[in-house]
Design a protein with these regions (language model features):
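Intrinsically disordered, low-complexity terminal regions
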Residues: 1-403
């Protein structure tokens, strides 16, 4: 479990920073671990407290891990001594490798990481469990603690399952043809042109994936999620607070945010199950069954090629759907406060029930039978009435027409 606290800079912090002793040039130590015996079906498990981890394809087919230890102190000798206290522990068991960066936790419980990706001036504090100890990391343009970290470049052969747990810092992956599980307590995770299954979980940070051939599971406690050009498996994405953007997706989709907008553009899979506690849901050029829920926000879908089920619900907002709903057998749209507008190119076979507590109801479809019109309500069968449509607006108009 980790806690991340964003700390704004102050005049006092600037003064303290200016008064602190100047650090010598960082001492850097490089090493490479190679194991040609690890083949497809094997695994690598890498754990690091703080730093930047890159995961790339092994061009020569050999598992290799490059480590780059960086330490800074008041003088070169102290920096070299500090760097020497960080060890890389490696365990091999058959076709599996475990590597862990062993920090001098008996000497230091607080570390500073000059995060080059930090936006602006200030720092973040992350408290996390590592190697059986409680550790605090200050990251940003300034901070306090032992100035010590290690960066890794992991060269992954095809089919070797890689797990990275990098508590603080960026994780990047590019061109890897293997299952991946990337985890961070506080840091962004990025991947492009990967194959096989992909998992990414961060406590705080953005997750961005593009050109992925395989199933995807992405989660962040606080941050945006972006996935583009995915095929070959289902998609699960979740953020506690942040936007979700999905473009050109081939798999079935489950997406959720506690607070933020959800955008899905271009989907050819079995359908989408999307939810936001507070925000809009926007779909364009989407195929399959749909379950869309917004606690507070609009639901808008255009150029839909709907499957058998379309369910939409918003506590406060409009529901607007257009496209081909001809294959739908169960349609429901519910808005506590807002209008419902549905336009379809093909008319489905269904019994329609449309009501509004305080608004107009306009259903105009060809071939309607058994029509019943009452104050703020409408019922009818269309195309044989095999399926059902339940349209209900607490406050707003209801419209259902053929384009």
């Amino acid at each position: 479990m980790s806690i991340r606290i964003a700390t704004l800079f102050s005049l006092a912090a600037v003064a303290a920073l200016a008064a602190s002793p100047a650090l010598a040039a960082p001492y850097q130590k490089d090493d490479t671990y190679k194991n040609p015996a690890i083949k497809a079906g094997g695994s690598l498990d890498l754990t690091n407290l703080v730093g930047h981890v890159s995961v790339v394809a092994a061009s020569d087919g050999v598992l290799a891990v490059d480590s780059h230890i960086v330490a800074a102190a008041g003088n070169d000798a102290d920096a070299q001594t500090l760097a020497g206290k960080l060890k890389i522990e490696t365990k091999v068991d058959g076709n599996a490798v475990e590597m862990m960066a062993k920090y001098p936790l008996d000497d230091y419980s607080t570390y500073y990481y000059h995060d080059k990706g930090f936006d602006g001036f200030g720092m973040n504090n992350t408290t996390t469990d590592y190697d059986g100890e409680r550790v605090r990391i200050s990251s940003g343009s300034f901070g306090s603690g032992a100035n010590l970290h290690v960066d890794f470049v992991v060269h992954v052969p095809k089919g070797v399952h890689v797990t990275v747990d990098n508590k603080v810092g960026l994780i990047e992956s590019a061109g890897v043809d293997a299952p991946q599980n990337l985890k961070s307590s506080s840091g962004d995770i990025k991947s492009d042109h990967g194959s096989d299954s992909f998992e990414a979980h961060t406590g705080s940070g953005d997750v961005t994936v593009s050109d992925q051939a395989g199933g995807v599971d992405m989660e962040t406690g606080s941050g945006d999620i972006t996935l583009s050009r995915q095929k070959g498996g289902d998609v699960k994405v979740e953020t506690g607070s942040g936007d979700v953007k999905l473009h050109d997706i081939a798999g079935g989709i489950h997406g959720e945010t506690g607070s933020g907008d959800v955008e899905l553009r271009g989907a050819t899979g079995s359908g989408a199950d999307l939810e936001t506690g507070s925000g809009d849901i926007v779909l364009d050029n989407v195929t399959g069954s749909l379950k869309l829920r917004a606690g507070s926000g609009d639901i808008r879908g255009t150029d839909l090629k709907a499957g058998q089920v379309v369910e939409t619900n918003t506590g406060s907002g409009d529901v607007t759907l257009s496209g081909d709903l001809g294959d739908v057998v169960r349609l429901s749209a519910d808005s506590g406060s807002g209008s419902i507008v549905i336009h379809t190119k093909r008319v489905p076979s269904m019994h329609i029930s449309a009501t509004s507590d305080s608004g107009d109801v306009d259903v105009d479809l060809p071939g309607m039978q058994n029509v019943s019109v009452r104050h703020h309500s409408f019922r009818a069968d269309v195309n044989g009435g095999k399926g059902s449509a339940e349209l209900e607006a607490g406050s707003g108009d209801v419209t259902f027409t053929k384009d």
